[in-house]
């Protein structure tokens, strides 16, 4: 089967099951697997929206303990004996009595060959409606605070009627607003400089009295008997007026700030009070703590910088030199808080609206461990914030929020495979099973992970190894299988279970060409990028780049055709040709190169990469570039190369985080002269309009909203484009500073070009000594 057909097949599987694998035929031995270089991995989007996934209104049929796999199309069913055989543990299970009428032609939906992904609506109701607790920074200028208040008031109308909402504001002090008290505005105040233990928070808020009685089953539709926390968290339908009033009356923090100081801001206390409030009464009920930070924490636990302006925020350089006063202590504080929050089943979203850093680097664990969002904007007045914030509350066709709470993902494998770990926004459930591997990749040593927050685009990299071989005379299996079970609280108030079961052939003896043909270079590039970013969090930058290079050289020397020590004979098959260039762009990307980015930006970019699926991640690693000219209709894809910059062309660059329209030199001059407004130049006006329309289309379903930039050749904003292009025409190419560089853009850089990179790669791959 040729590569184009295979790609189409993989994309159909992705649409149906939300899965892309690095290898679509599995090696038969551990030895063979180690020679593949790229691990067997799956990029899985559990809640991928697909209208045709059947939603079954009954409990799933499961295998006996400890296996608990779910009945699926790959099970053998003996209709006469009313039995089914589990492909994972090979146990025989009786079919339930109500399946007595099934025949070979009349089978239940979960056994239908096309239903490899299926969803069950379980009878277990959620313990309470979803909770939204707004934590608002009041140390900000009036225009920014007013814009934020508007967005928050508007968001109340997007929440389900029964959702519980609450409000905490903070500056020098933290205030918990008692919205259940209607006589006047009333709030509980916590000192910003003090570290409160969970018990103290609960006592001060008077939450210790009435724990929910164990064994009391919540009834769908009937509200839980509310404890003392109902003074702070109330259904939107009951408190919308009161909360709107409280939000509208918010004012800038009254504490005076000297000219040479930052405002005193106790972000750490505000978050730990929010976590304590939800922890006391709503453990393992779906809820979001939404933090709106307008600057860095300068006071109390979790402070990231002092209030003196002469002390700058830490940079990557400071961190490398260990010149960091608050970093380790703050990181420890937020990581402990993140563990607590994840254990309680709650989500923390961070919305940072500030030109300076707010401390995302220290706080990143809060969102990364709980599946929360992280949005980085210059100000809450920007449309980037307003539109991204609205998208958090998007709904499906049945008017339910497109967000799941308290998810648990469990992975089962047949005996040939073992799971080594997961990279994505989750925490380990420390669950051991026969499916758990010996090695560890990402969050390992478990077959089950907890995702407090999960949405239809949340994607997880799951990595596998081949099990140690059994006796050599044993009959090798024909197929290796995996089953992904995702339990989560649906926003309609019930628990759901999404089941995806996939099977792939197992290759023949060593060197089976089917394995090489089954390599999906796009999925592999994204899975390897996640490992590289995971390593970059703990290792030095240069070490990670060396690891990326070593892996690429090994892969090429294993799968390319060449004569030893002859680089000119080097050839890669079609399904490997793009992989080296993905790695070239990954090495230069902001995920691994921190130069020119603040530590907060690096934390943000890495957070988003670990959330997205294959196609979006590839745009981040290797942005797309389209060109628009008079002699063609619409945009045409061109190489991400400095040679693509031409004076009479318009370029549209999509890096996922930025969408940029670049006018070549001549186009920019015509535009400046106003030709587009003159009669007879309608085609020029049309040419200027076309990339804008295409850019708007790209923005429509993107989250977080990308920054939109329009710039001209020679303008300062053009740096966003130049930094992404392969520098094939630099000030050093060609004699006298570049022959042939009259038309293409000269890029002033010491970075190697893709061509030089490939030359070195070929040389190293064909020399048997790598």
UniProtKB/Swiss-Prot annotation:
What biological process terms from GO does the record include? COPII-coated vesicle cargo loading; intracellular protein transport
Quaternary assembly: The COPII coat is composed of at least 5 proteins: the SEC23/24 complex, the SEC13/31 complex, and the protein SAR1.
> Which organism is this entry from?
Pyricularia oryzae (strain 70-15 / ATCC MYA-4617 / FGSC 8958)
Location comes to: Cytoplasm; Cytoplasmic vesicle, COPII-coated vesicle membrane; Endoplasmic reticulum membrane; Golgi apparatus membrane
MF terms from GO for this chain are: GTPase activator activity; zinc ion binding
- Alphabetical list of InterPro entries matching this protein: ADF-H/Gelsolin-like_dom_sf, Gelsolin-like_dom, Gelsolin-like_dom_sf, Sec23, Sec23/24_helical_dom, Sec23/24_helical_dom_sf, Sec23/24_trunk_dom, Sec23_24_beta_S
**How is the protein disposed in the membrane?**
Peripheral membrane protein
Q: What is this protein called?
A: Protein transport protein SEC23
At the highest ranks, the source species' classification is: Eukaryota, Fungi, Dikarya, Ascomycota, Pezizomycotina
């Amino acid at each position: 089967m040729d590569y184009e057909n295979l790609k189409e097949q993989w994309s159909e599987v992705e649409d149906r099951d939300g899965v892309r694998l690095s290898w679509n035929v599995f090696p038969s031995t551990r030895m063979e697997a180690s020679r593949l270089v790229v691990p067997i991995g799956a990029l899985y989007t559990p809640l991928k929206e697909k209208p045709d996934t059947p939603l079954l209104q009954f409990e799933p049929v499961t295998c006996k303990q400890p296996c608990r796999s779910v009945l699926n199309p790959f099970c053998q069913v003996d209709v006469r004996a009313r039995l089914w055989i589990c492909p994972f543990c090979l146990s025989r299970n009786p079919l339930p009595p109500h399946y007595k009428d099934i025949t070979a032609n009349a089978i239940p939906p979960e056994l239908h060959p096309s239903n490899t992904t299926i969803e069950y609506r379980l009878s277990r109701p959620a313990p309470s409606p979803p909770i939204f607790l707004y934590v608002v920074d009041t140390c900000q200028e009036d225009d920014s605070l007013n814009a934020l208040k508007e967005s928050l008031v508007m968001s109340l109308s997007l929440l389900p009627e029964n959702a519980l909402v609450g409000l905490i504001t903070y500056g020098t002090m933290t205030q918990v607003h008692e919205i259940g008290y209607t006589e006047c505005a009333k709030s509980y105040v916590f000192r910003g400089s003090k570290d409160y233990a969970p018990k103290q928070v609960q006592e001060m808020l008077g939450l210790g009295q009435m724990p929910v009685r164990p064994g009391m089953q919540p009834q769908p539709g009937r509200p839980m008997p509310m404890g003392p926390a109902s003074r702070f968290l109330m259904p939107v339908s009951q408190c919308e007026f009161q909360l709107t009033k409280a939000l509208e009356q918010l004012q800038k923090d009254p504490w005076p700030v000297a000219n040479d100081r930052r405002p005193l801001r106790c972000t750490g206390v505000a978050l730990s009070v929010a976590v304590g409030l939800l922890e006391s009464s709503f453990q393992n009920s779906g809820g979001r703590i939404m933090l709106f930070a307008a600057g860095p924490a300068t006071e109390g636990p979790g402070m990231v910088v002092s209030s003196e302006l002469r002390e700058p925020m830490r940079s990557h350089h400071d961190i490398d030199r260990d010149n960091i006063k608050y970093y380790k202590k703050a990181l420890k504080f937020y990581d402990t808080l993140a563990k607590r929050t994840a254990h309680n089943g709650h989500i923390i979203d961070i919305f940072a609206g500030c030109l300076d850093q707010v401390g995302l680097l220290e706080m990143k664990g809060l969102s990364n461990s709980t599946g929360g969002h992280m949005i980085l904007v210059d100000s809450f007045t920007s449309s980037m914030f307003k539109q991204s914030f609205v998208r958090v509350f998007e709904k499906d066709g049945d008017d339910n929020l497109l967000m799941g709470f308290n998810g648990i993902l469990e992975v089962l494998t047949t005996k040939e495979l073992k799971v080594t770990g997961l990279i994505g926004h989750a925490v380990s459930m420390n669950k051991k099973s026969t499916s758990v591997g010996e090695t560890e990749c990402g969050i390992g040593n478990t077959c089950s992970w907890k995702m407090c927050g999960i949405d239809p685009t949340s994607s997880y990299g799951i990595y596998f190894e081949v099990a140690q071989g059994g006796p050599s005379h044993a009959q090798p299996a024909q197929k290796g299988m995996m089953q992904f079970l995702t339990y989560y609280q649906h926003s309609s108030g019930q628990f759901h279970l999404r089941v995806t079961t996939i099977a792939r052939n197992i290759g023949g003896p060593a060197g089976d060409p089917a394995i090489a043909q089954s390599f999906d270079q796009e999925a592999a590039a994204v899975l390897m990028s996640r490992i590289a970013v995971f390593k970059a969090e703990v290792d030095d930058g240069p070490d990670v780049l060396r690891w990326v290079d070593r892996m690429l050289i090994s892969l090429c020397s294993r799968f390319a055709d060449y004569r030893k020590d002859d680089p000119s004979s080097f050839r890669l098959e079609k399904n490997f040709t793009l992989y080296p260039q993905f790695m070239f762009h990954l090495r230069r990307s902001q995920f691994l190169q921190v130069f020119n980015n603040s530590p907060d930006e690096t934390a943000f970019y890495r957070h988003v990469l670990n959330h997205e699926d294959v196609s979006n991640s590839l745009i981040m690693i290797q942005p797309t570039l389209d060109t628009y000219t008079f002699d063609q209709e619409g945009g045409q894809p061109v190489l991400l190369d400095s040679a693509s910059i031409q004076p009479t062309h318009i370029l549209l660059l999509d890096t996922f985080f930025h969408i940029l329209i670049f006018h070549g030199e001549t186009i920019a001059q015509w535009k400046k002269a106003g030709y587009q407004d003159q009669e007879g130049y309608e085609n020029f006006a049309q040419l200027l309009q076309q990339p804008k329309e295409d850019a708007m289309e790209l923005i429509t379903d993107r989250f977080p909203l990308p920054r939109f930039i329009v710039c001209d050749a020679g303008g300062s904003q053009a740096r966003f484009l130049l930094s992404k292009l392969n520098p094939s025409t630099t000030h050093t190419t060609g004699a006298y500073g570049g022959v042939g560089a009259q038309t293409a853009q000269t890029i002033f850089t010491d970075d190697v070009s893709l061509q030089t990179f490939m030359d070195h790669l070929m040389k190293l791959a064909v020399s048997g000594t790598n």
